[in-house]
Swiss-Prot record:
Taxonomic classification: Bacteria, Bacillati, Mycoplasmatota, Mycoplasmoidales, Metamycoplasmataceae
Basic residues bias: start-end ranges: 1-10, 17-29
Positions of region (Disordered): 1-29
Similarity comment: family membership: Belongs to the bacterial ribosomal protein bS20 family.
Organism expressing this protein natively: Mycoplasmopsis pulmonis (strain UAB CTIP) (Mycoplasma pulmonis)
Gene that specifies this protein: rpsT
Swiss-Prot/TrEMBL keywords: Ribonucleoprotein, Ribosomal protein, RNA-binding, rRNA-binding
Pfam family name, one: Ribosomal_S20p
Protein name: Small ribosomal subunit protein bS20
GO cellular component, one term: small ribosomal subunit
Length: 89
């Protein structure tokens, strides 16, 4: 544990940010899983769930949780998965 007052405060701030970031990352992972599940089951609302997942990914990018390229990669892989399964269906 830090002894300096400013470091104690910065540790508290970092902990808040870590919790917030992990919550946002979890939300992104969940939305991607839901979208992929809907795609594989040929669900009617798959397109909407993919759109929701893109929204969550880009929101995480704008909040600084993901780097720009990471967000683009996640979106791109989800689109590839969607297009591959829609073409075969």
């Amino acid at each position: 544990m830090a002894n300096i007052k400013s470091k104690i405060k910065s540790i508290k701030t970092m902990e808040k940010a870590r919790k917030r970031n992990s919550m946002i990352k979890s939300r992104v992972k969940t939305s991607i899983k839901k979208a992929k599940l809907a795609i594989t089951q040929d669900s009617d609302n798959a397109k909407k769930l993919v759109s929701d997942a893109h929204h969550e990914i880009h929101k995480a990018k704008s909040k600084g949780v993901f780097h720009k390229n990471t967000a683009l990669r996640k979106s791109s892989r989800l689109d590839l998965f969607f297009n591959k399964h829609m073409k075969s269906a």
